[in-house]
Each structure stands twice: as structure tokens, then as C-alpha cells.
Amino acid sequence: MIDQRVTLKALAVAVLCSYATYSVAQGLGDTPGPETPSEIAPLEADPQILLNRLGTLTGEGDAVEATRLANEIQERWTHTGSATLDLLLQRGIDAMQDGDFVRAIAHLTALTDHAPEFAEGWNQRATAFFLTDRYGEALSDIEQVLILEPRHFGALAGLGIILEELGDEQGALRAFRAAQQIFPAEENVNRSVERLEAATGGRTL
């Protein structure tokens, strides 16, 4: 049970934090130069267009492009349009990575209070709540994320992680399958689907 718990915590950090951390750092750092691997045309800057494309990348050879595209999507998700609010998000993520969850939750709560329409603020606070075993609050925040952005693959994966931690394997499988449909090249999610299909016989209520 302890090993499984540690594995789920590590998976939560990998799935819920990685893309947002990359994206916010990109936004607050230097502007990428001309050697950026793949540019996205302005017409395709809408995350919904990018999400449509992400769902078509299903082959083993698509993993690098899918990860790049997921990062592009999260880069758009992690910008509020306000430098002050973007900084609150970055401070919350930094505090979470430092293990200071009280400070992380404080920053992210300030963010959700000031920008309740900003899905990523709720998503990152859900991560902090999960990592401090506050599952009810984490689930509530994930629900808010999915109201604002139903195709938030990180939040869906996070929902799967929490439900599995709570022993709801069928609910977890449904959540991971939903994330897989949006981001089929995500290895952590694919492994979770395989594991839970084996555990449940592939059945969900």
C-alpha cells in the first residue's frame, strides 16, 4: 500500500505539474529564438484547434510531437493575460515543487479568488490539495477545472489518480480513458489505463 501510494504521488506530480511548469517558465523567461523546433501558425493558436490535433497523434512515433503540442496547449492555458496573476501561478507552482504546500495553496487560492474563470489556477490548487491528502477539496477543484475546460487532460488524469487512490478503480478507469482520448500519446495515462483494465476486466459502471 505504501509503495502504491508513493507511485500515485509521483504520477500526480508528473502528470499534473510537468506541463504547467514548463509553460509558465517559458512565459516568464526569454522569448524563444528562431531555433524553436516547431512554430504554430497564429490561426492555430486556439487551444481547441490544438486539442483536436493532439487527439490524432496516436502512433508510437508521435510521442515527441504530441508532447510538444501538449506543451503548446498548456502554454496557452497557463496565461491569464495579467502578469500579476501569471506570477501568482508561478509562485504557487514553485512553492509546491519546494514542498511548501501551505504557501502554494495560499498563492493559488489568491489566484482562484481573483480569476475564478482561469482553469489552470484550480488545476494547480487541486494538485496541491491532493499532495497534502485533502482529496475532497482536490476533487472539488478538478470539477471546477472541467467545467471551465472539459478537455483538460491533466485534470482528467488527476481525477483518475485520486479515484484510484480512494479505491474507485472503475471511476479511475473512466477518467483515465477520457484523458487518453484527448491525449492518446501520454505514456503515464496509457499505463494507468492498461493497469486498471487488467484490475477491473475493462468494465466500468
What are these regions (language model features)?
Residues 82-154:
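Alpha-helical adaptor scaffolds
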Residues 2, 17-86:
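N-terminal leader/linker segments that initiate helical-solenoid repeat arrays
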Residues 54-61, 74, 112, 146, ...:
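A conserved position within tetratricopeptide repeats
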Residues 97, 131, 165-166, 198-202:
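Register position in tetratricopeptide repeats
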Residues 28-37, 41, 68, 75, ...:
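Terminal, low-structured helical/coil segments at or just beyond the last alpha-helical repeat
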